[in-house]
């Protein structure tokens, strides 16, 4: 293993620590995935407890690990920290071959204030991570304004283009209220962004990897599981590193076609209903079938539509036992129409 410490901004004391593991030789692969660690500290400092221990946990899983000690203290004015992130991510991608990593498989993990920075990276950065792990992240106005007035509130910037997110928090966090994670989770759900969330019964704030030598308070015995769970989730999102290289991701990034540039039977009923009158005419076989079901079961058509609105057009047509040929014909017509998003 090699370690490098690169100064990104001497005036603001911004550094990037790189931990680079070997490839080839006894290993049968040439590139590893990478993780960029963003420690917390209220934008006043970067916590050591959320730096090396986190990097080492991901290195054990095969990752090249990087720790960004971004602008804090008197240099924390926004957008300095985000600019530090952009510079670090650009450097990691630029040196991907030298640092033996896959530039398309760089994730980021952030804690507290670093979780805020990580959430901003996932939502508004030019160089978004392939996936973002947000551990007790600062998201909402009260906590963000306390750390640094003028910073963005990440949940307000979530779109379909936001990086997939893994959220970790404890219900009894009295530093960053659990509503921060819940509101971020809701924004991700509303925009169709893949996510996984683990809210533990107790653990407070600042538990990092929750190993005994790191924490100084009581946490649920299950809190340390977030590390292995997040690594497992990254395998689903980016593919797994095996002795022979990477496997393909085994989770679809998009749950439906609502964010695609053109319409299809993969779009949800709720989304299709927002489209043009021309689209509604094409949906006549679906609407007729739903009216028949509503009449047979004593439901209102509006009530049935609301209940199944999250299902895709294909799922509903199949439930109505519409012939596959007709489904494909509808799909072909929809493919000729622009998706009006928003």
Predicted regions and their residues:
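Short beta-strand element of the alpha/beta-hydrolase
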Residues: 31-40
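Conserved alpha/beta-hydrolase "acid-adjacent" motif
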Residues: 174-183, 226
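Short beta-strand/loop motif that positions the catalytic acidic residue
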Residues: 161, 166-169, 173
């Amino acid at each position: 293993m090699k370690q490098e410490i690169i100064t990104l901004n001497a005036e603001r004391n911004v550094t990037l620590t790189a931990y680079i593991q070997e490839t080839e030789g006894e290993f049968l692969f040439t590139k590893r995935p990478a993780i960029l660690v963003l420690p917390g500290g209220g934008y006043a400092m970067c916590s050591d407890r959320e730096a090396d221990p986190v990097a080492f946990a991901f290195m054990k899983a095969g990752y090249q690990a990087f720790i960004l000690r971004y602008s804090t203290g008197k240099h924390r004015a926004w957008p300095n920290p985000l600019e530090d992130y952009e510079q670090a991510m650009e450097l990691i991608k630029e040196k991907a071959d030298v640092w033996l990593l896959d530039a398309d498989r760089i994730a980021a993990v952030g804690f507290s204030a670093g979780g805020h920075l990580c959430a901003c990276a996932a939502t508004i950065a030019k160089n978004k991570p392939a996936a973002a792990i947000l551990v007790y992240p600062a998201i909402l106005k009260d906590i963000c304004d306390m750390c640094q007035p003028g910073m963005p509130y990440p949940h307000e910037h979530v779109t379909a283009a936001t990086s997939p997110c893994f959220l970790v928090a404890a219900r009894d966090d009295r530093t960053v209220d659990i509503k921060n994670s819940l509101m971020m989770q809701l924004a991700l759900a509303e925009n169709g962004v893949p996510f996984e969330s683990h809210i533990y019964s107790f653990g407070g704030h600042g538990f990092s990897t929750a190993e005994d030598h790191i924490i100084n308070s009581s946490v649920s015995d299950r809190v340390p599981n977030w590390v292995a769970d997040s690594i497992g989730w990254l395998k689903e999102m980016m593919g797994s590193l095996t002795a022979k290289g990477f496997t393909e991701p085994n989770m679809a990034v998009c749950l439906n076609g609502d964010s695609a540039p053109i319409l299809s039977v993969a779009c949800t009923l709720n989304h299709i209903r927002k489209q043009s009158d021309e689209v509604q005419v094409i949906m006549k076989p679906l609407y007729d079938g739903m009216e028949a079901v509503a009449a047979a079961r004593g439901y209102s058509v509006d009530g049935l539509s609301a209940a199944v609105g999250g299902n895709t057009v294909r799922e509903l047509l199949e439930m109505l036992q519409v012939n596959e040929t007709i489904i494909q014909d509808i799909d072909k017509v929809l493919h000729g129409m622009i998706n009006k998003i928003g």
